[in-house]
Amino acid sequence: MNRLAVEIPGLSLKNPIMPASGCFGFGQEYSKYYDLNELGAIMAKAVTPEPRLGNPTPRVAETASGMLNAIGLQNPGLEHVLAHELPFLEQFETPIIANVAGATEDDYVQVCARIGESKAVKAIELNISCPNVKHGGIAFGTDPDVAHRLTKAVKNVATVPVYVKLSPNVADIVSIAQAIEAAGADGLTMINTLLGMRIDLKTRKPIIANGTGGLSGPAIKPVAIRMIHQVREVSNIPIIGMGGVQTVDDVLEFLIAGADAVAVGTMNFTDPFICPKLISELPKRMDELGISSLQELKKERTNQ
């Protein structure tokens, strides 16, 4: 038995570690550094129906223990991704999780209905942190009813399992998670970035041209752990955890809190080899902590 293996809807993972969406592109650059078959899965960059240029620069800023970004979902659009990006990933055994974004419910439905045409795509990650342009720009993921309706609409057309990425910028993460699970989601990914800002002391203006950006990196890990634990207390839905993972101990902390697998985001920019490093270090650390397998760790968590 593979002690690192994880089985969740649509995904047979050889290990629980994967790069998070937005920090790995579509994998081509990283494939020059290591074999992508080492990874448990790959969360690909967000896709929208039409190409997007993204936000004006500067759109990235370093912070203490993290970074801010306001990329604005820059991507080449659905048709280009299906024709040029996903075919490259089909040569690997590693399952691909396609991240889908949009400005309207119809945008999500359009992409989710077709993204599964690629044989590499084994699941969808629904980015519901996007502003809903038909409802005053409020993010889809901040209202349980809106999140429920969007999830249901996507489930009606998707040909692969659907994981919904939760925004931490809410008062009650549990009610959002429960609404999404009730709509038929196959799993959750959590958490997305926290809204933040940095000010340039000389210009007296925000460093990010957009004003605000998403805070990621080690600074948000305690928030991610807390939210995953809260959701796991009330639900058995599969969870892919993320938010500030740097070390193998971070990986195990997420798994003990309630995640079934773990995604690494910002650290890919600091160390492009971070995912294979964590994968190679995990068995030894499990031995040191008396963890025979991730399957046993999950049983232990369930019985508490």
Swiss-Prot record:
It is found in: Cytoplasm. It holds the Pfam family DHO_dh. Transmembrane segments: none annotated. Its main location: cytoplasm. Signal peptide: none annotated. Heterotetramer of 2 PyrK and 2 PyrD type B subunits. Catalyzes the conversion of dihydroorotate to orotate with NAD(+) as electron acceptor. This is Dihydroorotate dehydrogenase B (NAD(+)), catalytic subunit. It comes from Listeria monocytogenes serotype 4b (strain CLIP80459). The gene is pyrD.
